[in-house]
UniProtKB/Swiss-Prot annotation:
GO CC terms: fungal biofilm matrix; mitochondrial outer membrane
Name used for this protein in its record: NADH-cytochrome b5 reductase 2
A Gene Ontology BP annotation from the UniProt entry: ergosterol biosynthetic process
Binding residues annotated for FAD, in chain numbering: 155-190
Listed transmembrane segments: 13-33
PANTHER family: NADH-CYTOCHROME B5 REDUCTASE, NADH-CYTOCHROME B5 REDUCTASE 2
Reaction(s) catalysed by this chain's protein: 2 Fe(III)-[cytochrome b5] + NADH = 2 Fe(II)-[cytochrome b5] + NAD(+) + H(+)
Length: 298
């Protein structure tokens, strides 16, 4: 077999050869750099590392609830969270003991530069006691994401979301994401219970979404008592009879999501067995004939 012989480049061509390589390498580098720049850096990537985020501002939501805005590392950073996922927060007590709690953000998943939470203060709650004494520029440790439910558009004809108190946060995340996706035709029933009209969290955002997507989103509020004299929603609790009349039945292509305080969960679905285990389905939803797989507890 004959092999071709290649002449060694003469000295006078070397600068041009080197220059061509440099230009090509530079073009590849810049192209790669532009590609990297176009991808917003994700903060929470599941590496189990704690990252300190600075508190940017606090806004009063109600008499016992606040919105907390934490700055991400850069203005172009995004959280990296997936739909219906949460993060862990942590601080150390004076005795050196860690206090860790999960929270679901309410900011858009693609929001750049910050992450937002709506958090209620619980008397004697170690984390909320700590959070409610924070001031802008203080930091808090975060880790995530904690995946909850992998949402797939158009998997169900209609979903029913049952929320109580601050349990609205993961449900709001679902509502917001589904309505923003023009390809997702899933219809949504949101039944949300609070102590009083003043305790209804994210009401402006929810009402705006209902006005914008009236054919897709149906919201009904429930309160224990009316402290305004102007409330025109439902008074009392979300009951089995109400669900039987207003939610798709278990024989339909549907899914139910539930999130709220222990008494709320006990009444409708039963509590989770542990943070990672759903536990047995009980309460009103079981009585109505829903299967374990048709109900998800946040």
């Amino acid at each position: 077999m004959a092999f071709a012989r290649f002449a060694r480049p003469t000295q006078r061509f070397l600068p041009f050869a080197i220059g061509a390589v440099a230009v090509t390498a530079g073009a590849l580098y810049l192209n790669g750099w532009n590609t990297i720049k176009n991808e917003n850096p994700k903060v929470f990537i599941g590496d189990r590392k704690w990252i300190d985020l600075e508190l940017e501002k606090i806004i009063e939501e109600s008499h016992d609830t606040k919105r907390f805005f934490f700055k991400l590392p850069t203005d172009d950073s995004v959280s990296g969270l997936t739909l219906a996922s949460a993060v862990l927060t942590k601080f150390m007590t004076p005795k050196g003991n860690p206090v860790i709690r999960p929270y679901t953000p309410v900011s858009d998943l693609s929001e750049k530069g910050y992450i937002e939470f709506v958090i209620k203060h619980y008397e004697g709650g170690k984390m909320t006691d700590h959070l409610f004494q924070l001031k802008p520029k203080d930091t808090l440790a975060f880790q995530g994401p904690i995946p909850k439910w992998q949402w797939k558009p158009n998997s169900f004809d209609t979903i029913t979301l049952l929320g109580g108190g601050t349990g609205i946060t993961p449900l709001y995340q679902l509502v917001h994401h589904i309505t923003q996706n023009k390809e997702d035709k899933t219809k949504i029933n949101l039944f949300y219970g609070s102590k009083t009209p003043s305790d209804i969290l994210l009401k402006k955002e929810l009402d705006d979404l209902q006005k914008k997507y009236p054919e897709q989103l149906n919201i009904q509020y429930f309160v224990d008592k009316d402290d305004t004299g102007k409330f025109d929603g439902n008074k009392g609790f979300i009951t089995k009879d109400f669900l039987a009349k207003n939610a798709p039945g278990p024989k339909e292509k549907t899914q139910v999501f539930v999130c709220g305080p222990p008494p709320f969960m006990d009444s409708l679905s039963g509590q989770k067995k542990s943070p990672m285990e759903q536990g047995d389905l009980t309460g009103a939803l079981k009585d109505l004939g829903y299967s374990q797989d048709q109900v998800f507890k946040f």
